[in-house]
Amino acid sequence: MTNITTENCAALLDILREKNPLVHCITNYVTANTVANGLLAAGASPVMADSPLDAEDITAKASAVLFNMGTLSKDRLRAMLISAQKAADMAKPIVLDPVGAGSTDNRLRSTMQLLRQFRFAAVRGNASEISALLMTSPITMKAEKGVDSAETTLEDKISLAKKAAKRYSCTVMVTGST
């Protein structure tokens, strides 16, 4: 495993900016502007497109795909399924942000459908969201109400990340409270 250093990060950022990858984002309207600006600042070119009619074509042109489960709708889920299939067919990485995964049955069911059907390069979420994906509820955690995270220790987050990474065969990042 390579140690993460400032120099390594700077070199990777230079490569990212040189390649200027197109990233197909199917995200929620709450964060679309922030996500687009973050990708632009990093050197990528985001395309914010959540229509099932565009999903296959845009994913075919993209270098990577990002799914955000916030403000989930039937059409947005359909677009994700179409996009994920195209990304899988073309071996393109997909990142999943399971926003509020444990807050409703629909979000959890939809997120689990994606995780069962497709391989993700990475999943990022707060402790409550990752716990929901593992169908666990550590004693230190409260029930998830929305996109807020339960109080957890660093050790809890590390344990959740390791368990989820093993289960879903991908990189898992457990973020702090939102």
Residue spans for each PLM region:
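Small-residue (G/A/S/T)-rich helix-start motifs and N-terminal tracts that mark the onset
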Residues: 1-88, 93, 158-178
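Glycine/small-residue-rich loop that forms an oxyanion/phosphate-binding "nest" at active or ligand-binding sites
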Residues: 68, 76-125
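Glycine-rich nucleotide phosphate-binding loop and flanking beta-alpha elements
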Residues: 72-73, 102, 130-131
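Conserved phosphate/ATP/ADP-binding segment of small-molecule kinases
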Residues: 106-178
